[in-house]
Amino acid sequence: MKFGKTYVTHQIPEWSIYYMNYKQLKKIIKSIDSAANTNVDESKYPEVISDTLGSFFYDLDRDIEKVDSFYNTKFKEYNRRLNKIFQVLGYQDGQITHNIESSEELDEIINILIELKSLFRNLKWFAELNHKGFIKILKKLDKKLTSILSQHSGVSVGGVSNHNQEAYMGSRINALPFANGTEASNCLDSIHHILSRIETRNDVVQETIPVENNETSISALIKNDDFEGLKKHITIKSSQKFLISTLNKAALANSTKCIDVIWNQLDMLYDDSDFNGRNFFHQHIISLGKAQFIREEQIVPGEVTNRLIGGDNGPDNSNKNDNPIGLLYILNKLKHKRLILAEDHYHRTPLHYASQYGLVEVTRYLVEFGVKWGLINTSISIDDVSIWGDQEGLTPLHLSIIGKHPKTTETLLGFNKAQTLTCPNLLLLAVRLNSPQILNSLIVEGNIDVNYTDIDHRNETALYIASKLNHPDLVEFLLESNANTEIGENVFGWTPIFIAASEGFMTIVKLLKEYGASYDIVDDSGWLPMEHACLRGHLDVTDLLLPKNEKLLLYDMYHPENNLPRIPSLAASPVLTGSDDGTVSTSSIDKLPEPQKNTVNQFYKQLKNNSSNNVSRSTSPKRNKRYKPVKSFGHRYLNEDESLILLTLGTTDLRDTNVPVELNKVSLAKSFATELDTALSLSITCRHKLTNNPVEPPVVVDLPLEDFHGSATDPISFKLSNDLTVNDVIITFDIIPTYQVNKKVIGRAIALLKDAYTKVGPNLRSLNNSIAIPIIESTNLDILGTIRFEYLQVLPFKHKAMSIARSDTYWKQLVSTRVIGHRGLGKNLSGKKSLQLGENTVESFIAAASLGASYVEFDVQLTKDHVPVVYHDFTVAESGVDIPMHLLTLEQFMGFNTPTEKPTHTVDDEVLTRGKQRAQSSYQLSNNHNDDIEKEFANQRDERMKFTKTWKNQGYKGNLRGSSVASNFVTLRELFRKLPNNVGFNIEVKYPMLDEAQLEDMGEIGVDLNFFVDTILKVIYDENTTGRDIVFSSFHPDICLLLSLKQPTMPVLFLTEAGTAPMYDIRASSLQNAVRFSKKWNLLGIVSNALALIKTPRLAQVVKSMGLVCVTYGTENNEPELAKIQMRAGVDAVIVDSVLAVREGLREHNETMNEFEDSPTE
C-alpha cells in the first residue's frame, strides 16, 4: 500500500490537524515534473526549479515546527502526570517503596498508568509517523531532482542538490526530540515495569480498614440498604477517602438510607490527597460509565485504542441501566453546589465524564442543576474550548461526539439552542464517525453551516468526507440539507464526485448526479471524474459520468489545438497544470517514479539512426518533447546462480477478505507483561535453514495492515545467491514492538517454503496459493494469531544462446501506429458472411503478414508431454469434452484437427502469400468428404463439440471445418520454421489464473510456473536463429514477471482487461494497477482492452508518462475510426482481426502525421 494512504489511516484522529501536510508537499514535488513537461524555456528552467524548491522547504519548515511544538507540549504534560504517580508509589531505581492503602486506590493507579501508557504510545506513534513522513517526502524530492537533473544534463542548475534527505534529516530534523523518541520510550519502559511489578507483588496494598472482609461486608449491606448494619462500620475515625468511596457504592446501589448514614459523617465531598484531584461526582460518574475494570477489557494487539470512547456499553450507554436515583438524591442534599462542575487535574468536570460515557440522564441532571444554580452561563456555547476545554482541548460536546452518543449530544445541544457552536469542525468529526443522528443535531440544533470547510486542512466539506468514506446515508442526508456539491478540497481540486468516482462508489455517484453535481468539470490536473473512474477499473461508474459533450473526452496529442477546452471545478487552482503543447498532467493520478532519462536519450538516438525498416521520418523537437521513454534491452534479470523469492502478505485474490495478519484479542492485564498493547510491527526475515543466519536484511511492516491486498502489487522480495533455493531457507515472521530500541520478539511464525504448498505431481502445482500459519507467543507458546501469505520462487533460465549483446530496441515509437494481426489474420467469429481463415493457423499468420501486419499475435500453451503449441482456449473443445490442454499429449491434440483429404485439396498457400483475390467457389473446403463413413464421423465429432462449455458460451468454435478455412493445429517450433523472418511474433503466453480455472471448470491444477516458462523460452532460443522480433504478452501477472526476470532481451507486455471484465487478481483489476505492475517489473508496456481507451482516450498518456508502451486489443479495434481515436491519443499499436481494413483506414491518419511532422516548429 502506498505511504500516502497509510499515512492518513494511521493518524490519531483527534490530532489529525497537527501532522505534517504530506499531501501538499507531494503536490509541490509533482509541480516540478509538470514544469518539466511544458514548453518552458530551458534558460528559465533553473529559476522555475529554484522557486518551486523555495516553496517546498518553506512549507516543510512550517510542518517541522508544528510537529515539534505539539510533541513537546504533550510530552511535558504527560511526563508531569507520570512523575506524580512516581511520587505516590515512591518509585525510584526500579523499585516501588510505598504501599497503597486500598485495592480501590491501586485500581485507580493502574487505570491512570494504562491511560498514560496509551497517551505515550500515541505520542510515540505520532512522532514516528511524522518522522517517516519527512524521510519519505525528502526521498521523493531527491528522486525527482535526480531524474530532472539527468534529463537536463546540458543545463546548469546551480545550487540544486539531490541529496536533501541526508542533509536535511541530519541538520534539521534528527536533532529534535520527536525524531529520536528516547524520552517517550523511557517513560513507556517505566510504566511497563511498574505495571509488571504491581501484577507480581502481593504486598503493594496494605488495607487500613480493620474489619476482616470489610469490602465484601460493606457491599452486601449497601446492596440491601441496611443502614443500621452500615453504622457499625462508619466511625468518626473513618478517613475521608473511605467515606467518599463508600458513598459512591451507596449511590450506585441507589440505597438512599445508607447515603444518609454516610452523609452525616462527611465534611466535604472531595479528598485533598486524591492524586487526580477528583471529587465524589467525578468518581461516581466514572463508576456509572464503566462496564468493567479496565484490566479485564479485551484489546486487539497493536491497534490504536481510543481512550476517549467511554466503555463498551454502546451509544449513550444503551447496554447499561442509566437510572441515577442515588445521584439525584445527593444533588438535592448538596450544599457545596460548585462541586458538580469542579475540575480535576486534567481540567475535566463531571459533565465531561458524563458526556464521554454517554450517560444521558446524568448529563441532563448536571446541565439542569448547573443552569438552575447559576453555574452554567447559557450565553456561552457548550463547545467553547476557552471555557469548557480540558487539557486536550476537548469539551463535553467533543467527548460526546467522539464517543458516538447521539442522545447525549442532543441533550447538550438542547440548552445551547440560542448559541451557534464555536467549533464547526465538529461537523466533519461526526461525518468521519458515520453518525447521522449527531450530524442532524449539529446542523439543526447547533446551527453549523452544512458547507463548512476547514480551510487550513485541505478544505474538505462534510459532503466530501462522507463521499470519500462511502457513507451513502450521510451523503443523502447532507444533500437533502442543501450541501453544495461543487465545493472541493484544495490539494487536487476534487469535488465530491471526483472522490466517489475514483473509488468506484456507484451509489454515491448516483446520489450526487441526482442532486445536480457537475461531472463535466476537471480537477487541477485537467482530468474528468469519468477518467479517474476508468483508470481505476470502475467502468460501471464510468458510464454514469459521460459528459454532455462527449467530444471533451477526445484527445489529440499531435494537434492540441483540436482539443476542446475543459472547465475546471470551483476548487481547482486558477491555472491548471498543463500546457499549450498538449502535454497532459497526471499529478492526481497517483504517478509512479519516472524512468531513467539516459535510457530515453539513448532510445531517441537509436530511433533517429535505425529507422531503415520503417517509414523514413525525422523526429521533430516538438514530437520529442511529448514522448516519454520506451524501454531498451538489457533489463535486470537473474544470473545463473540466483533466484528470487516473492512474498505477498494476504493474497492477490480480491475475493479473499481474510485479514493477512490476524491477532487474537488479549486482556489488558496480560498485555502488561507481553507489550501487546503497544504499536506492533511484523518483521519478515529469510534465514538459512541450517545456520539460522539472515540471507538478507529483514523487511519490517507496521501493523495493522489497512489494505488486505496492498502487498500484491509490491511483494516482499528476497534474492538468493550462490545456488540457494527454497529448500535451503525458511521465512520467519516476528511480531515486535514498533517503537522500542531493543526489538523484543513477542511472537513468531515460521514457514518452511519447501513444503508450504501441497504437492500435486511432477512439474505441476495447485492454483490455490494461500498459506496460513500460526503465530506462537514467545513467553507461553500460546497461539497469538495467524499469518496468511503467498510466495513465488523465480528460478533462473539457462541457455547457451542467451545474451544481452543487442543494444537497440524492438519497439520504436513509430510515426504510424503498428497493426498486429489477432490470432493471425483474425479471431474467428460466428455468423460472418465472408469466409474466414482458421485462427491460430499457419495460413492465417501468412495472410496477416501479407496484408501489412507488423507482428502476428498468437497464444501458446503446453501439452501434457511439455510441447509448446499454438491454441487459444484453456480447454480443447475439439475433443468433445472440456479437457485442459495440459492433460493432452501432442499427438492427441494434433489429431483433433487433422484433415481427411490430401493437402492439395485444402487451400493454396501460394495464393495466400501473394494475397491475390480468388473466387470463393474455387476453394476446396475441408467438409467435402469423399466417403460417407468419414462424413458421418466428422458430423459426430462436431455434434459432440456442441456439448462443451466453449460451444455453449460462444455458439461456435474457432478454426472449425465448415465455418472457416480450417487447417492443422501448429506447434511453436513449426511456426518459427514456416513463417517469414520479417514477421514479428507477439507471443501471448496462456496460463490460467485461479478465477479463470474456476470459471472454465477445468480443475485448479496447472503446470509449474518456472517449468512452463522455461520450456517455452528453450524452444524460442533454439529456433530463433535469424533475429526475428519477438514480444511476449500474458494476462497472468506471474507469467509476465517470470518472463522479465528470466531473460534480458525479449520485451514483455502485460495484458489487462482494464476493468472491462471482472478480474479477481488485484494486479489485473484495473488500468492503474496494470501500469503499476508493469513499471515495478520493468515490462515493456501494457496491452489494454481497447474499450477503456476508447471511452477515455487521455488515459493513454498515463501509460506513456510512465515510459511504457501502450497497445490495445478488442473487437472495437476493427473499426478504423475507433482505431484513429486511440492513435491520436498516443496508442502505439492496435491488435485487430480485420488487418487490411484497419491498415487502409489508418493510411489517411499517417499522411496527416507526415504533414504535422514536416511542418515547421517554433
Swiss-Prot record:
It is an enzyme of class 3 (hydrolase). PROSITE patterns: ANK_REP_REGION, ANK_REPEAT, GP_PDE, SPX. Belongs to the GDE1 family. Residues 817-1146 form the GP-PDE domain. Disruption phenotype: Results in altered glycerophosphocholine catabolism. Leads to hypersensitivity to 5-fluorouracil (5-FU). Its EC number is 3.1.4.2. This is Glycerophosphocholine phosphodiesterase GDE1. Glycerophosphocholine glycerophosphodiesterase responsible for the hydrolysis of intracellular glycerophosphocholine into glycerol-phosphate and choline. The choline is used for phosphatidyl-choline synthesis. Required for utilization of glycerophosphocholine as phosphate source. C.albicans can utilize GroPCho through transport and intracellular hydrolysis or through extracellular hydrolysis. It comes from Candida albicans (strain SC5314 / ATCC MYA-2876) (Yeast). Pfam families: Ank_2, C2_GDE1, GDPD, SPX. It is found in: Cytoplasm. ANK repeats lie at residues 346-375, 392-421, 423-452, 458-487, 492-521, 525-554. Induction: Expression is positively regulated by the transcription factor PHO4. Induced during early phase of biofilm formation. The keyword Translocase does not apply. GO terms for cellular component: cytoplasm. It catalyses: sn-glycerol 3-phosphocholine + H2O = sn-glycerol 3-phosphate + choline + H(+). One of its GO terms (molecular function) is glycerophosphocholine phosphodiesterase activity. Keywords: ANK repeat, Cytoplasm, Hydrolase, Repeat.
